[in-house]
């Protein structure tokens, strides 16, 4: 929604917005762009009769009973959903490159937008995070090309279709597919049905790029695909895309297409998952005319989005990272990448299970295993979590501490830290400001202060 606000303003509209709790980086971005942000949902923000907004864009987190929503309906103010606004006002006559999938959407769409930018295509984009190569999550662009992070979550309380069915991409990337969003989907099959609807919107002359090793994606493709296809493979192949890691942490790898080397990429990112994200972005860029060698060169200058294994700081030799991982697969993948980078050094995970799916307990039986390659973990159990986290963590093979107060988490984590440790904070929310609190606590933690004396 913050990105949509930027696009609407760029189209010449006066834009205001409201929310209950906006946190960085989006709150910072809106402030820097001069967009007024109103805290809360007092209907008075809609103005007086005769001065109502021309249009209200309602986010999918809003439901009936919200004071502003009820006022919009009662007053007859025109309204729409975010995806429909994008489809009606931004995407017409654009070559849409949509990046979808359970994991890696923000990273892959950021890579793709940067490749196009670096190669002179001047694309528009709308991305869930803030790509640091651009500093904003959205812009109109100066060409026909528009990159969009295509989410399967529903559009609004009045439109329960997945957001991405509104986008009509000509280039579609499906990164991967797992069960998620248990609050709106009954099972994986329900999610696959929505992806099938998305595939139906891609024109015959368009292209669908997908991972051949994903059984769930393959099943979805087999439901019907009328467009050209390109596939990514983990193993070496003579048809499609694959990569060969040249370093243990995957920060260097060679790219192959149809069995031919396209070049070697050495960059700041780590992990097999980022190799896969890069291949998808390179393949999508090739569809609009970018040579793979040029895309590889562009990615050497790529800076990952904020909150995607972002180094927040190093205090007394302790490195603190921020990561958006909120699904057991993403948690395990991130830890695997960090382990390859730091070797035998201690890795501490600080996790807030905040997504609706996590809070429901759907992933409680796989959460402990997802942290297997870490050395210890501290979990924050908020009041909104109604399953016994401590009981679920009995299956863990590493020490796991469950705490109910954020300040207690900060105190325990900072007290256990030693020089050379890596701490990874994982949450898809603001985590009650824990990140800054932890960095501050490490600065004055007794074990480091005593050493300094």
What is the predicted role of each segment?
Residues 1, 63, 105, 215, ...:
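Gly/Ser/Thr-rich loops at beta-strand to alpha-helix junctions
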Residues 1-25, 31-37, 52-56, 77, ...:
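ATP-dependent carboxylate-amine ligase
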Residues 16-19, 38-43, 82-87, 125-129, ...:
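Beta-strand->loop->alpha-helix junctions that form or flank phosphate-binding loops
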Residues 20-23, 41-43, 60-63, 84, ...:
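Short, polar loop motifs at secondary-structure junctions
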Residues 95, 234, 257-267, 313-318:
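Glycine/charged-rich beta-loop-alpha catalytic/anionic-binding loops adjacent to active sites
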Residues 245-261:
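Acidic-glycine-rich active-site phosphate/pyrophosphate-binding loop
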Residues 254, 273-274:
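C-terminal accessory "lid"/substrate-recognition subdomains
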